[in-house]
Amino acid sequence: MTSNALKVFISDLHGELDVFDFLADRQFGILHLLIRQQFSPELNETLCAAIEASAIRLCRAANASQAQLDRTSAVSKEILFTALFLMVVQQKAEDESLTIAIRRWGWLSTVHRALSGDAQLSCTPFSQLVEMLAQNIRTLSAQDFFALVQAFAKALFKKLSPELNIVGDIYDRGQDAFAIMERLRGLPNVAIQWGNHDVVWMGAASGNLACITVAVRICLRYGTLDMLHRDYGINLSRLERFAAKAYGDDDCAQFTPKGDLNAEEKLRIARMHKAISIIQFKLEGKLIARRPEYTMADRLLLDKINIANSTVTVGDAVHPLLDSNFPTLDVEQPYRLSEDERKVAEDLKQQFLASAKLTQHMDILFHRGGMQKKTGDWLLYHACVPVDEQGEFQPFALAPETTRGQSLFNFCELEMRRGYLNRMVINDRNESDIAWFLWCGPHSPLFGKARMTTFERYFVADKQTHKEGKNEYYNLRSNPEFLARVATELKCSSDQVRIVNGHVPVKYQSGERPVQANGKLFSIDGGFSMPYRSATGLAGFVLLEALGQIVLYRVIPNDKRYALEVEYQQILKPKAASVPAA
Protein backbone atom coordinates (compact mmCIF):
# COMPACT_ATOMS: atom_id res chain seq x y z
CA MET A 1 0.00 0.00 0.00
CA THR A 2 1.34 3.41 -0.95
CA SER A 3 1.12 6.55 1.15
CA ASN A 4 -1.45 9.07 -0.05
CA ALA A 5 -2.07 12.73 0.74
CA LEU A 6 -5.79 11.91 0.99
CA LYS A 7 -6.33 9.75 4.06
CA VAL A 8 -9.60 8.27 5.33
CA PHE A 9 -10.20 6.47 8.63
CA ILE A 10 -13.28 4.45 9.55
CA SER A 11 -13.79 1.70 12.12
CA ASP A 12 -16.15 -0.92 13.48
CA LEU A 13 -18.17 -1.64 10.37
CA HIS A 14 -19.56 -4.80 12.03
CA GLY A 15 -20.90 -6.11 8.74
CA GLU A 16 -23.14 -3.07 7.99
CA LEU A 17 -22.98 -2.60 4.22
CA ASP A 18 -25.42 0.27 3.72
CA VAL A 19 -23.33 2.83 5.62
CA PHE A 20 -20.15 1.60 3.95
CA ASP A 21 -21.69 2.05 0.49
CA PHE A 22 -23.04 5.49 1.41
CA LEU A 23 -19.52 6.59 2.32
CA ALA A 24 -17.82 4.86 -0.61
CA ASP A 25 -20.13 6.66 -3.07
CA ARG A 26 -18.84 9.95 -1.66
CA GLN A 27 -15.19 8.94 -1.68
CA PHE A 28 -15.63 8.55 2.10
CA GLY A 29 -16.51 12.23 2.51
CA ILE A 30 -13.83 13.71 0.26
CA LEU A 31 -16.31 14.58 -2.52
CA HIS A 32 -18.62 16.18 0.06
CA LEU A 33 -15.73 18.26 1.43
CA LEU A 34 -14.39 19.24 -2.01
CA ILE A 35 -17.71 20.52 -3.33
CA ARG A 36 -18.37 22.65 -0.28
CA GLN A 37 -14.80 23.91 -0.13
CA GLN A 38 -14.79 25.02 -3.77
CA PHE A 39 -18.36 26.27 -4.26
CA SER A 40 -19.46 27.72 -0.92
CA PRO A 41 -20.52 30.41 -0.32
CA GLU A 42 -20.97 31.10 -4.06
CA LEU A 43 -23.50 28.24 -4.20
CA ASN A 44 -25.96 27.52 -1.41
CA GLU A 45 -26.15 24.15 0.35
CA THR A 46 -29.06 23.02 -1.82
CA LEU A 47 -27.01 23.46 -5.00
CA CYS A 48 -23.95 21.86 -3.40
CA ALA A 49 -26.08 18.87 -2.44
CA ALA A 50 -27.51 18.74 -5.98
CA ILE A 51 -24.00 18.68 -7.47
CA GLU A 52 -22.96 15.94 -5.07
CA ALA A 53 -26.06 13.85 -5.73
CA SER A 54 -25.67 14.21 -9.50
CA ALA A 55 -21.99 13.33 -9.33
CA ILE A 56 -22.72 10.23 -7.28
CA ARG A 57 -25.64 9.13 -9.44
CA LEU A 58 -24.18 9.80 -12.86
CA CYS A 59 -20.44 9.92 -12.65
CA ARG A 60 -19.21 6.74 -11.05
CA ALA A 61 -17.68 4.95 -14.02
CA ALA A 62 -19.21 1.65 -13.01
CA ASN A 63 -22.73 3.03 -12.58
CA ALA A 64 -23.22 5.90 -15.01
CA SER A 65 -25.53 5.26 -17.94
CA GLN A 66 -26.85 7.21 -20.92
CA ALA A 67 -30.41 6.48 -19.81
CA GLN A 68 -29.81 8.07 -16.40
CA LEU A 69 -28.31 11.12 -18.02
CA ASP A 70 -31.22 11.55 -20.43
CA ARG A 71 -33.62 11.80 -17.46
CA THR A 72 -31.64 14.66 -15.91
CA SER A 73 -33.00 18.20 -16.31
CA ALA A 74 -31.14 20.71 -18.48
CA VAL A 75 -30.40 22.95 -15.48
CA SER A 76 -28.98 20.01 -13.50
CA LYS A 77 -26.85 19.05 -16.47
CA GLU A 78 -25.35 22.53 -16.63
CA ILE A 79 -24.65 22.57 -12.88
CA LEU A 80 -23.13 19.10 -12.94
CA PHE A 81 -21.03 19.69 -16.04
CA THR A 82 -19.71 23.04 -14.85
CA ALA A 83 -19.01 21.88 -11.31
CA LEU A 84 -17.22 18.73 -12.43
CA PHE A 85 -15.08 20.61 -14.91
CA LEU A 86 -14.10 23.27 -12.38
CA MET A 87 -13.20 20.62 -9.80
CA VAL A 88 -11.14 18.71 -12.37
CA VAL A 89 -9.17 21.85 -13.27
CA GLN A 90 -8.66 23.04 -9.71
CA GLN A 91 -7.55 19.58 -8.54
CA LYS A 92 -5.22 19.25 -11.56
CA ALA A 93 -6.81 15.91 -12.36
CA GLU A 94 -5.35 14.26 -15.44
CA ASP A 95 -6.76 11.52 -17.62
CA GLU A 96 -6.03 10.52 -21.21
CA SER A 97 -9.68 10.68 -22.31
CA LEU A 98 -10.05 14.11 -20.67
CA THR A 99 -6.96 15.41 -22.47
CA ILE A 100 -8.36 14.22 -25.80
CA ALA A 101 -11.70 15.92 -25.04
CA ILE A 102 -10.04 19.23 -24.21
CA ARG A 103 -8.12 19.13 -27.48
CA ARG A 104 -11.26 18.30 -29.45
CA TRP A 105 -13.48 21.10 -28.11
CA GLY A 106 -11.75 24.46 -28.32
CA TRP A 107 -14.04 26.17 -25.81
CA LEU A 108 -13.07 23.58 -23.19
CA SER A 109 -9.42 24.27 -23.91
CA THR A 110 -9.98 28.02 -23.56
CA VAL A 111 -11.62 27.70 -20.14
CA HIS A 112 -9.05 25.15 -19.01
CA ARG A 113 -6.16 27.45 -19.96
CA ALA A 114 -7.78 30.46 -18.29
CA LEU A 115 -8.38 28.61 -15.04
CA SER A 116 -4.89 27.11 -15.16
CA GLY A 117 -3.20 30.54 -15.23
CA ASP A 118 -2.61 31.21 -18.94
CA ALA A 119 -1.26 34.78 -19.04
CA GLN A 120 -3.36 35.79 -22.07
CA LEU A 121 -6.62 34.44 -20.66
CA SER A 122 -6.29 34.71 -16.87
CA CYS A 123 -7.89 38.17 -16.83
CA THR A 124 -11.18 36.70 -18.14
CA PRO A 125 -13.85 37.10 -15.41
CA PHE A 126 -14.77 33.84 -13.69
CA SER A 127 -18.48 34.41 -14.33
CA GLN A 128 -17.76 34.75 -18.06
CA LEU A 129 -15.91 31.42 -18.09
CA VAL A 130 -18.80 29.70 -16.32
CA GLU A 131 -21.29 31.18 -18.78
CA MET A 132 -19.10 29.97 -21.67
CA LEU A 133 -19.32 26.43 -20.30
CA ALA A 134 -23.08 26.68 -19.80
CA GLN A 135 -23.70 28.00 -23.35
CA ASN A 136 -21.57 25.40 -25.06
CA ILE A 137 -22.99 22.46 -23.15
CA ARG A 138 -26.35 23.21 -24.80
CA THR A 139 -24.82 22.53 -28.20
CA LEU A 140 -23.53 19.07 -27.28
CA SER A 141 -25.29 15.93 -28.37
CA ALA A 142 -26.47 13.64 -25.58
CA GLN A 143 -23.74 11.16 -26.50
CA ASP A 144 -20.96 13.77 -26.42
CA PHE A 145 -22.24 15.21 -23.15
CA PHE A 146 -22.29 11.76 -21.58
CA ALA A 147 -18.74 11.05 -22.79
CA LEU A 148 -17.47 14.33 -21.36
CA VAL A 149 -19.16 13.85 -17.99
CA GLN A 150 -17.66 10.37 -17.72
CA ALA A 151 -14.22 11.70 -18.66
CA PHE A 152 -14.46 14.42 -15.99
CA ALA A 153 -15.73 11.97 -13.41
CA LYS A 154 -13.06 9.34 -14.07
CA ALA A 155 -10.30 11.93 -13.88
CA LEU A 156 -11.70 13.45 -10.69
CA PHE A 157 -12.38 10.20 -8.85
CA LYS A 158 -8.96 8.90 -9.81
CA LYS A 159 -7.44 12.05 -8.35
CA LEU A 160 -9.57 11.81 -5.22
CA SER A 161 -9.05 8.09 -4.56
CA PRO A 162 -7.95 8.02 -0.91
CA GLU A 163 -5.81 5.83 1.27
CA LEU A 164 -8.54 3.99 3.17
CA ASN A 165 -7.69 2.82 6.69
CA ILE A 166 -10.17 0.56 8.49
CA VAL A 167 -9.34 0.61 12.20
CA GLY A 168 -10.76 -2.82 12.95
CA ASP A 169 -13.90 -4.93 13.13
CA ILE A 170 -15.15 -5.48 9.62
CA TYR A 171 -16.78 -8.63 11.02
CA ASP A 172 -19.33 -9.15 13.81
CA ARG A 173 -23.11 -9.26 13.97
CA GLY A 174 -24.03 -7.58 10.67
CA GLN A 175 -24.95 -9.78 7.74
CA ASP A 176 -22.74 -8.15 5.11
CA ALA A 177 -19.11 -8.57 6.20
CA PHE A 178 -18.67 -10.81 3.14
CA ALA A 179 -19.97 -8.08 0.82
CA ILE A 180 -17.73 -5.46 2.44
CA MET A 181 -14.69 -7.70 1.94
CA GLU A 182 -15.69 -8.06 -1.72
CA ARG A 183 -15.82 -4.27 -2.02
CA LEU A 184 -12.39 -3.96 -0.41
CA ARG A 185 -10.93 -6.42 -2.92
CA GLY A 186 -11.65 -3.88 -5.65
CA LEU A 187 -10.10 -0.88 -3.90
CA PRO A 188 -6.43 -0.18 -4.66
CA ASN A 189 -5.28 1.48 -1.46
CA VAL A 190 -6.66 -0.17 1.69
CA ALA A 191 -5.06 -0.93 5.05
CA ILE A 192 -6.74 -2.75 7.93
CA GLN A 193 -5.84 -2.65 11.59
CA TRP A 194 -7.19 -5.87 13.01
CA GLY A 195 -10.08 -5.75 15.47
CA ASN A 196 -10.97 -8.50 17.91
CA HIS A 197 -13.95 -9.57 15.76
CA ASP A 198 -11.65 -9.82 12.75
CA VAL A 199 -9.11 -12.04 14.51
CA VAL A 200 -11.87 -14.48 15.45
CA TRP A 201 -12.42 -15.14 11.74
CA MET A 202 -8.70 -15.13 11.06
CA GLY A 203 -8.22 -17.69 13.82
CA ALA A 204 -11.14 -19.74 12.49
CA ALA A 205 -9.58 -19.73 9.01
CA SER A 206 -6.36 -20.90 10.68
CA GLY A 207 -8.23 -23.95 12.01
CA ASN A 208 -8.51 -22.88 15.64
CA LEU A 209 -11.50 -24.74 17.06
CA ALA A 210 -12.28 -22.19 19.78
CA CYS A 211 -12.38 -19.38 17.20
CA ILE A 212 -14.47 -21.48 14.82
CA THR A 213 -17.14 -22.07 17.45
CA VAL A 214 -17.16 -18.38 18.42
CA ALA A 215 -17.65 -17.34 14.78
CA VAL A 216 -20.47 -19.85 14.27
CA ARG A 217 -22.12 -18.93 17.58
CA ILE A 218 -22.21 -15.22 16.69
CA CYS A 219 -23.75 -16.01 13.29
CA LEU A 220 -26.42 -18.12 14.99
CA ARG A 221 -27.07 -15.49 17.66
CA TYR A 222 -27.60 -12.69 15.14
CA GLY A 223 -29.17 -14.67 12.32
CA THR A 224 -26.39 -14.16 9.77
CA LEU A 225 -26.43 -17.75 8.53
CA ASP A 226 -26.49 -16.70 4.87
CA MET A 227 -22.93 -15.43 5.22
CA LEU A 228 -21.80 -18.79 6.57
CA HIS A 229 -23.67 -21.02 4.13
CA ARG A 230 -24.24 -19.04 0.93
CA ASP A 231 -21.12 -16.86 0.98
CA TYR A 232 -18.47 -19.03 2.62
CA GLY A 233 -19.92 -22.47 1.90
CA ILE A 234 -20.03 -23.58 5.56
CA ASN A 235 -22.76 -26.21 5.96
CA LEU A 236 -24.28 -26.55 9.44
CA SER A 237 -26.31 -29.69 8.76
CA ARG A 238 -24.23 -31.90 11.09
CA LEU A 239 -24.57 -29.32 13.87
CA GLU A 240 -28.31 -29.08 13.21
CA ARG A 241 -28.79 -32.85 13.43
CA PHE A 242 -26.79 -33.02 16.64
CA ALA A 243 -28.71 -30.11 18.19
CA ALA A 244 -32.06 -31.71 17.34
CA LYS A 245 -30.90 -34.96 18.94
CA ALA A 246 -29.28 -33.53 22.08
CA TYR A 247 -31.67 -30.63 22.74
CA GLY A 248 -34.86 -31.89 21.09
CA ASP A 249 -36.89 -31.52 24.30
CA ASP A 250 -35.35 -28.14 25.23
CA ASP A 251 -36.90 -24.80 24.26
CA CYS A 252 -33.42 -23.21 24.58
CA ALA A 253 -35.10 -19.95 25.57
CA GLN A 254 -31.82 -18.31 26.60
CA PHE A 255 -30.50 -18.89 23.09
CA THR A 256 -33.34 -17.44 21.03
CA PRO A 257 -31.70 -15.72 18.03
CA LYS A 258 -32.10 -12.07 17.13
CA GLY A 259 -34.06 -11.14 14.03
CA ASP A 260 -37.50 -11.53 12.50
CA LEU A 261 -38.01 -15.30 12.29
CA ASN A 262 -41.02 -17.55 12.62
CA ALA A 263 -41.39 -19.70 15.75
CA GLU A 264 -40.17 -22.88 14.05
CA GLU A 265 -37.02 -21.21 12.70
CA LYS A 266 -36.31 -19.58 16.06
CA LEU A 267 -36.48 -22.91 17.87
CA ARG A 268 -34.32 -24.68 15.28
CA ILE A 269 -31.63 -22.01 15.43
CA ALA A 270 -31.87 -21.67 19.23
CA ARG A 271 -31.03 -25.37 19.61
CA MET A 272 -28.05 -25.03 17.28
CA HIS A 273 -27.05 -21.88 19.14
CA LYS A 274 -27.05 -23.65 22.51
CA ALA A 275 -25.27 -26.69 21.11
CA ILE A 276 -22.39 -24.67 19.64
CA SER A 277 -22.16 -22.53 22.79
CA ILE A 278 -21.58 -25.55 25.02
CA ILE A 279 -19.03 -26.90 22.53
CA GLN A 280 -17.34 -23.48 22.59
CA PHE A 281 -17.10 -23.41 26.40
CA LYS A 282 -15.60 -26.91 26.42
CA LEU A 283 -13.03 -26.09 23.74
CA GLU A 284 -12.14 -22.85 25.50
CA GLY A 285 -11.58 -24.82 28.68
CA LYS A 286 -9.11 -27.05 26.88
CA LEU A 287 -7.32 -24.03 25.42
CA ILE A 288 -7.08 -22.31 28.83
CA ALA A 289 -5.62 -25.50 30.30
CA ARG A 290 -2.87 -25.71 27.67
CA ARG A 291 -2.20 -21.96 27.85
CA PRO A 292 -1.68 -21.11 31.55
CA GLU A 293 0.22 -18.00 30.43
CA TYR A 294 -3.11 -16.50 29.35
CA THR A 295 -4.14 -16.36 33.07
CA MET A 296 -7.78 -17.10 32.28
CA ALA A 297 -8.66 -19.69 34.93
CA ASP A 298 -11.57 -17.46 36.02
CA ARG A 299 -13.24 -18.31 32.69
CA LEU A 300 -13.44 -22.00 33.62
CA LEU A 301 -17.08 -22.18 34.68
CA LEU A 302 -18.43 -25.50 33.44
CA ASP A 303 -16.73 -27.24 36.38
CA LYS A 304 -18.40 -24.73 38.74
CA ILE A 305 -21.90 -25.89 37.77
CA ASN A 306 -23.94 -27.79 40.35
CA ILE A 307 -26.54 -29.56 38.26
CA ALA A 308 -28.40 -30.95 41.30
CA ASN A 309 -28.96 -27.46 42.71
CA SER A 310 -29.15 -25.67 39.33
CA THR A 311 -26.46 -23.21 40.40
CA VAL A 312 -23.06 -22.01 39.26
CA THR A 313 -20.27 -20.46 41.30
CA VAL A 314 -18.82 -17.31 39.74
CA GLY A 315 -15.95 -15.94 41.78
CA ASP A 316 -16.98 -16.28 45.41
CA ALA A 317 -20.73 -16.15 44.80
CA VAL A 318 -23.25 -18.86 43.99
CA HIS A 319 -25.90 -17.94 41.42
CA PRO A 320 -29.01 -19.75 40.19
CA LEU A 321 -28.79 -20.90 36.59
CA LEU A 322 -31.22 -19.53 34.02
CA ASP A 323 -30.87 -22.81 32.12
CA SER A 324 -29.81 -26.06 33.80
CA ASN A 325 -30.23 -28.56 30.98
CA PHE A 326 -26.76 -29.89 30.10
CA PRO A 327 -27.28 -33.30 28.46
CA THR A 328 -23.68 -33.52 27.17
CA LEU A 329 -21.94 -32.34 30.36
CA ASP A 330 -19.88 -34.97 32.17
CA VAL A 331 -19.54 -33.73 35.75
CA GLU A 332 -16.36 -35.76 36.17
CA GLN A 333 -14.80 -34.33 32.98
CA PRO A 334 -16.81 -31.19 32.19
CA TYR A 335 -14.51 -30.03 29.37
CA ARG A 336 -14.54 -33.34 27.51
CA LEU A 337 -16.45 -33.26 24.23
CA SER A 338 -18.96 -36.00 23.64
CA GLU A 339 -18.28 -38.08 20.55
CA ASP A 340 -21.04 -36.25 18.66
CA GLU A 341 -19.69 -32.87 19.74
CA ARG A 342 -16.20 -33.85 18.63
CA LYS A 343 -17.53 -34.80 15.18
CA VAL A 344 -19.38 -31.48 14.88
CA ALA A 345 -16.24 -29.52 15.79
CA GLU A 346 -14.04 -31.49 13.41
CA ASP A 347 -16.57 -31.14 10.58
CA LEU A 348 -16.65 -27.37 11.02
CA LYS A 349 -12.85 -27.19 11.13
CA GLN A 350 -12.49 -29.04 7.84
CA GLN A 351 -15.07 -26.77 6.20
CA PHE A 352 -13.44 -23.57 7.44
CA LEU A 353 -10.04 -24.75 6.21
CA ALA A 354 -11.49 -25.77 2.83
CA SER A 355 -13.48 -22.58 2.12
CA ALA A 356 -11.77 -20.92 -0.85
CA LYS A 357 -13.70 -17.67 -0.43
CA LEU A 358 -12.92 -17.46 3.27
CA THR A 359 -9.25 -18.04 2.52
CA GLN A 360 -9.36 -15.29 -0.11
CA HIS A 361 -10.84 -12.81 2.36
CA MET A 362 -8.49 -13.80 5.18
CA ASP A 363 -5.57 -13.36 2.77
CA ILE A 364 -6.69 -9.74 2.42
CA LEU A 365 -6.77 -9.27 6.20
CA PHE A 366 -3.29 -10.74 6.56
CA HIS A 367 -1.71 -9.08 3.51
CA ARG A 368 -3.23 -5.63 4.02
CA GLY A 369 -3.56 -5.72 7.78
CA GLY A 370 -1.72 -5.77 11.05
CA MET A 371 -1.91 -4.90 14.73
CA GLN A 372 -1.04 -1.24 14.15
CA LYS A 373 0.00 1.23 11.48
CA LYS A 374 1.69 4.59 11.20
CA THR A 375 0.76 6.70 8.18
CA GLY A 376 1.98 10.28 8.04
CA ASP A 377 1.37 11.76 11.48
CA TRP A 378 -1.33 9.20 12.30
CA LEU A 379 -0.95 6.18 14.60
CA LEU A 380 -3.69 3.58 14.23
CA TYR A 381 -4.66 0.61 16.41
CA HIS A 382 -8.07 -0.84 17.16
CA ALA A 383 -8.50 -0.85 20.93
CA CYS A 384 -5.68 0.01 23.31
CA VAL A 385 -2.10 -0.33 24.46
CA PRO A 386 -2.71 -2.19 27.74
CA VAL A 387 -1.53 -0.47 30.92
CA ASP A 388 -1.84 -1.29 34.61
CA GLU A 389 -3.57 0.83 37.25
CA GLN A 390 -0.45 2.99 37.58
CA GLY A 391 -0.45 3.69 33.85
CA GLU A 392 2.63 1.56 33.18
CA PHE A 393 2.65 -0.65 30.11
CA GLN A 394 1.19 -3.96 31.23
CA PRO A 395 3.51 -6.99 31.02
CA PHE A 396 2.32 -10.25 29.42
CA ALA A 397 4.15 -13.56 29.83
CA LEU A 398 3.00 -14.82 26.42
CA ALA A 399 6.46 -15.43 24.96
CA PRO A 400 9.73 -16.78 26.37
CA GLU A 401 10.39 -13.16 27.32
CA THR A 402 7.83 -10.85 28.92
CA THR A 403 6.22 -8.56 26.35
CA ARG A 404 4.54 -5.17 26.73
CA GLY A 405 3.67 -2.24 24.53
CA GLN A 406 5.40 -2.51 21.16
CA SER A 407 6.91 -5.94 21.85
CA LEU A 408 3.42 -7.23 22.73
CA PHE A 409 2.03 -5.96 19.41
CA ASN A 410 4.99 -7.47 17.54
CA PHE A 411 4.65 -10.87 19.23
CA CYS A 412 0.89 -11.10 18.67
CA GLU A 413 1.15 -10.17 14.99
CA LEU A 414 3.96 -12.66 14.37
CA GLU A 415 2.03 -15.47 16.08
CA MET A 416 -1.11 -14.63 14.10
CA ARG A 417 0.83 -14.92 10.85
CA ARG A 418 2.52 -18.15 11.92
CA GLY A 419 -0.82 -19.69 12.86
CA TYR A 420 -2.29 -18.89 9.45
CA LEU A 421 0.75 -20.00 7.46
CA ASN A 422 0.88 -23.30 9.39
CA ARG A 423 -2.87 -23.95 9.34
CA MET A 424 -2.47 -27.19 7.40
CA VAL A 425 0.51 -28.38 9.47
CA ILE A 426 -0.19 -30.89 12.23
CA ASN A 427 1.86 -29.96 15.30
CA ASP A 428 1.43 -29.26 18.99
CA ARG A 429 2.45 -25.60 18.89
CA ASN A 430 -1.12 -24.29 18.51
CA GLU A 431 0.09 -20.90 17.26
CA SER A 432 -3.44 -19.90 16.29
CA ASP A 433 -4.42 -19.86 19.99
CA ILE A 434 -3.19 -16.26 19.99
CA ALA A 435 -6.21 -15.29 17.86
CA TRP A 436 -8.54 -16.46 20.62
CA PHE A 437 -6.47 -14.61 23.25
CA LEU A 438 -6.67 -11.41 21.19
CA TRP A 439 -10.44 -11.91 20.90
CA CYS A 440 -11.18 -12.15 24.62
CA GLY A 441 -7.99 -12.43 26.70
CA PRO A 442 -7.63 -10.25 29.81
CA HIS A 443 -6.49 -6.80 28.67
CA SER A 444 -5.62 -8.05 25.18
CA PRO A 445 -4.66 -5.06 22.98
CA LEU A 446 -7.64 -5.82 20.72
CA PHE A 447 -10.14 -6.43 23.55
CA GLY A 448 -9.06 -4.05 26.30
CA LYS A 449 -11.12 -5.56 29.10
CA ALA A 450 -10.49 -7.82 32.08
CA ARG A 451 -12.79 -10.63 30.96
CA MET A 452 -15.41 -11.57 28.39
CA THR A 453 -18.53 -12.69 30.25
CA THR A 454 -20.25 -14.72 27.53
CA PHE A 455 -21.19 -17.61 29.86
CA GLU A 456 -22.66 -15.30 32.49
CA ARG A 457 -24.78 -13.43 29.94
CA TYR A 458 -26.41 -16.70 28.87
CA PHE A 459 -26.79 -18.40 32.24
CA VAL A 460 -26.77 -15.86 35.13
CA ALA A 461 -29.39 -13.16 35.73
CA ASP A 462 -27.26 -11.02 38.07
CA LYS A 463 -25.93 -8.25 35.83
CA GLN A 464 -23.03 -7.64 38.19
CA THR A 465 -21.53 -10.83 36.77
CA HIS A 466 -21.83 -9.40 33.25
CA LYS A 467 -19.40 -6.56 33.89
CA GLU A 468 -16.13 -6.91 31.99
CA GLY A 469 -13.98 -4.04 33.30
CA LYS A 470 -12.17 -1.73 30.87
CA ASN A 471 -8.40 -1.41 30.85
CA GLU A 472 -6.95 1.67 32.57
CA TYR A 473 -5.93 2.91 29.10
CA TYR A 474 -9.45 4.26 28.62
CA ASN A 475 -9.23 6.42 31.75
CA LEU A 476 -5.88 7.86 30.68
CA ARG A 477 -6.24 8.46 26.96
CA SER A 478 -7.68 11.95 27.40
CA ASN A 479 -4.28 12.99 28.80
CA PRO A 480 -1.90 14.32 26.09
CA GLU A 481 1.16 13.38 28.15
CA PHE A 482 0.00 9.77 28.41
CA LEU A 483 -0.66 9.65 24.66
CA ALA A 484 2.85 10.99 24.01
CA ARG A 485 4.24 8.06 26.04
CA VAL A 486 2.11 5.64 24.03
CA ALA A 487 3.29 7.15 20.74
CA THR A 488 6.93 6.90 21.82
CA GLU A 489 6.44 3.27 22.89
CA LEU A 490 4.98 2.48 19.46
CA LYS A 491 7.97 4.10 17.72
CA CYS A 492 6.25 7.33 16.68
CA SER A 493 8.57 10.20 17.49
CA SER A 494 6.68 13.09 15.87
CA ASP A 495 5.18 15.57 18.32
CA GLN A 496 2.37 16.02 15.76
CA VAL A 497 1.22 12.40 16.01
CA ARG A 498 -2.51 11.79 16.32
CA ILE A 499 -3.90 8.46 17.52
CA VAL A 500 -6.99 6.81 16.03
CA ASN A 501 -8.90 4.09 17.93
CA GLY A 502 -12.16 2.25 17.38
CA HIS A 503 -13.65 -0.59 19.46
CA VAL A 504 -15.56 1.41 22.09
CA PRO A 505 -18.77 3.07 20.82
CA VAL A 506 -18.88 6.80 21.48
CA LYS A 507 -22.10 7.43 23.45
CA TYR A 508 -22.74 10.68 21.64
CA GLN A 509 -26.28 11.11 22.93
CA SER A 510 -24.95 10.95 26.50
CA GLY A 511 -22.44 13.70 25.88
CA GLU A 512 -19.35 11.68 24.95
CA ARG A 513 -17.29 13.10 22.11
CA PRO A 514 -14.87 11.42 19.70
CA VAL A 515 -12.06 13.99 19.87
CA GLN A 516 -9.96 13.88 23.04
CA ALA A 517 -6.72 15.25 24.45
CA ASN A 518 -6.85 18.49 22.45
CA GLY A 519 -7.11 16.71 19.13
CA LYS A 520 -4.42 14.12 19.87
CA LEU A 521 -6.85 11.17 19.95
CA PHE A 522 -9.82 10.34 17.73
CA SER A 523 -12.15 7.58 18.91
CA ILE A 524 -14.21 6.82 15.81
CA ASP A 525 -16.57 3.94 16.64
CA GLY A 526 -19.76 5.88 16.08
CA GLY A 527 -22.37 3.19 15.54
CA PHE A 528 -22.08 1.63 12.09
CA SER A 529 -23.69 -1.35 13.80
CA MET A 530 -27.45 -0.89 14.13
CA PRO A 531 -27.73 -2.17 17.76
CA TYR A 532 -25.31 0.53 18.96
CA ARG A 533 -27.18 3.43 17.36
CA SER A 534 -29.55 3.76 20.30
CA ALA A 535 -26.49 4.65 22.41
CA THR A 536 -24.53 6.67 19.87
CA GLY A 537 -27.44 8.34 18.09
CA LEU A 538 -25.30 8.11 14.97
CA ALA A 539 -24.45 5.70 12.16
CA GLY A 540 -20.69 6.11 12.46
CA PHE A 541 -17.85 8.56 12.01
CA VAL A 542 -15.52 9.13 9.07
CA LEU A 543 -12.24 10.94 9.65
CA LEU A 544 -10.34 12.63 6.80
CA GLU A 545 -7.03 14.25 6.20
CA ALA A 546 -7.70 15.86 2.85
CA LEU A 547 -7.43 19.13 0.95
CA GLY A 548 -5.27 20.71 3.66
CA GLN A 549 -7.67 19.89 6.48
CA ILE A 550 -8.54 17.35 9.13
CA VAL A 551 -12.29 16.80 9.12
CA LEU A 552 -14.33 14.43 11.25
CA TYR A 553 -17.86 13.80 9.98
CA ARG A 554 -20.77 12.36 11.89
CA VAL A 555 -22.89 9.99 9.81
CA ILE A 556 -26.49 10.92 10.63
CA PRO A 557 -29.09 8.15 10.17
CA ASN A 558 -32.52 9.00 8.83
CA ASP A 559 -34.55 5.88 8.20
CA LYS A 560 -32.61 4.15 5.39
CA ARG A 561 -30.82 7.34 4.33
CA TYR A 562 -27.78 9.07 5.75
CA ALA A 563 -26.19 12.51 5.81
CA LEU A 564 -22.78 13.89 6.75
CA GLU A 565 -22.35 16.62 9.36
CA VAL A 566 -19.06 18.14 10.49
CA GLU A 567 -18.05 17.21 14.04
CA TYR A 568 -14.51 18.60 13.99
CA GLN A 569 -12.48 20.60 11.49
CA GLN A 570 -8.89 21.82 11.59
CA ILE A 571 -6.96 23.66 8.89
CA LEU A 572 -3.45 22.23 8.62
CA LYS A 573 -0.43 24.44 8.40
CA PRO A 574 1.78 23.66 5.39
CA LYS A 575 4.87 21.75 6.44
CA ALA A 576 8.14 23.55 5.92
CA ALA A 577 10.17 22.08 3.09
CA SER A 578 13.30 20.31 4.27
CA VAL A 579 16.55 21.99 3.29
CA PRO A 580 19.24 19.65 1.93
CA ALA A 581 22.47 19.58 3.91
CA ALA A 582 25.29 21.61 2.41
Curated annotation (Swiss-Prot):
GO terms for molecular function: fructose 1,6-bisphosphate 1-phosphatase activity. It catalyses: beta-D-fructose 1,6-bisphosphate + H2O = beta-D-fructose 6-phosphate + phosphate. Keywords: Carbohydrate metabolism, Hydrolase, Manganese. Its EC number is 3.1.3.11. Its cofactor is Mn(2+). InterPro entries: FBPtase_class3, Metallo-depent_PP-like. One of its GO terms (biological process) is gluconeogenesis. It is an enzyme of class 3 (hydrolase). Pathway: Carbohydrate biosynthesis; gluconeogenesis. Disulfide bonds: none annotated. Pfam families: FBPase_2 (PF06874). Belongs to the FBPase class 3 family. HAMAP family: FBPase_class3. This is Fructose-1,6-bisphosphatase class 3.
